[in-house]
Amino acid sequence: MHSIKPSDKLQNNQPETLLDSVMDSPAQRSIRAQDLTDEAFAPYGDIIKPRISGEQFDRAYSYDPSKENTHVKLVMTNGEPTLRIMHQRLRGLTFSKMARHRRVSQRLGSLQGKEWFMAVATPTNNDSQPRLEDIAAFLIPGDRIIKLHVGTWHAGPHFKHEECLFLNLENEDTNTRDFQEMTLPQVCQIEI
C-alpha cells in the first residue's frame, strides 16, 4: 500500500488526493424549499392558478383574457407541442444534476392534487452554468402548474409520495434535441 509523504503533496495548497478534496467539502448542500409566490418564482417562470369558470351560455359571466391573472404566455417554437402524463415513482428530495431547455417553456403540474418540489436556477447565457448558491427550491401546491422560462435550469419534479402523476407540456423532441444537462459539484438536498 502506498502512503502519501509530505514531499508528495501538490503545490499551491491543493488537496493531496481526491478523497481529501471530497472530505474538505460538506457531503450535501441543503436548499430550503420556499412557498410558491408570483414574486419569488418570477425569475424562473410563471404560476398557472385555478380560476372560476362561468357556464358556457351564462350571460352574466363575461370572460376577458386580458383581465385574467391566471394566464401565462407559452413558448412552443421550433418543434411540435406534446402534452403527456408522466407517472413517476418516489425519487426523494436529493439531486446531483440539473437540466434546461433553450427552445421551449416547459409546464409541469401534479394531476392528483399532491404537493411536490422543484429546484430551479435562473437562465444563463451560452454554456455557463448556475452556481450552487443560486439554486432555489419551491414547494408546489397540488392545484398549481408551473411554467418555466426558456432556459431555466431545473431539477425535479421531486416529491415525498410513493408515486405521482404529472402533466407535462413541452415539445415532442424536448428531451432529445433541446436538452442540456449539468452535473453539480455537490449533491443537493431540498429541505422542508
Q: Can you describe what each PLM-predicted range is?
A:
Residues 141-145, 164, 172-174, 190-192:
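Glycine-rich loops and low-complexity Gly/Arg-rich segments
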Residues 114-116, 136, 142-144, 162-165:
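A short pocket-lining beta-strand/turn micro-motif at the edge of beta-sheets
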Residues 2-137, 175-178, 182-183, 188-192:
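Non-catalytic, conserved peripheral segments adjacent to functional cores
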